[in-house]
UniProtKB/Swiss-Prot annotation:
GO cellular component: mitochondrial inner membrane; mitochondrion; respiratory chain complex IV
Transit peptide location: 1-24
Family per record: Belongs to the cytochrome c oxidase VIII family.
Protein name: Cytochrome c oxidase subunit 8B, mitochondrial
Gene name, Swiss-Prot/TrEMBL: Cox8b
Function: Component of the cytochrome c oxidase, the last enzyme in the mitochondrial electron transport chain which drives oxidative phosphorylation. The respiratory chain contains 3 multisubunit complexes succinate dehydrogenase (complex II, CII), ubiquinol-cytochrome c oxidoreductase (cytochrome b-c1 complex, complex III, CIII) and cytochrome c oxidase (complex IV, CIV), that cooperate to transfer electrons derived from NADH and succinate to molecular oxygen, creating an electrochemical gradient over the inner membrane that drives transmembrane transport and the ATP synthase.
Lineage of source species: Eukaryota, Metazoa, Chordata, Craniata, Vertebrata
TM regions (residue ranges): 36-59
Pathway(s) served: Energy metabolism; oxidative phosphorylation
Mitochondrial intermembrane side: 60-70
Annotated GO MF terms: cytochrome-c oxidase activity
Top-level taxon of the source organism: Eukaryota
């Protein structure tokens, strides 16, 4: 097994010299600005997406307790 460390060094060599490309991040303003109505609709959909399932679970909490105890 004395040949294992040189083989491992050969496998690790390409890792040292890999070139990682820069991320292409642009900070330009939006091409079409978002209206207040679009923002309101988006926020209400996000809030409803979180609150409706949570409310459903909380309203059925007693039935969950009964079914797990049986």
């Amino acid at each position: 097994m004395p040949r294992l460390p040189p083989i491992l060094r050969l496998l690790q060599a390409p890792e040292k010299y890999t070139v990682i490309p820069k991320a292409r991040i642009s900070s330009k303003p939006a091409k079409s600005p978002t209206s207040a109505m679009d923002q309101a609709v988006g926020m209400s959909v996000i809030i409803a997406g979180f609150m409706v399932p949570a409310g459903w679970v909380l309203s059925h909490l007693e039935s969950y307790k009964r079914s797990s105890a049986a």
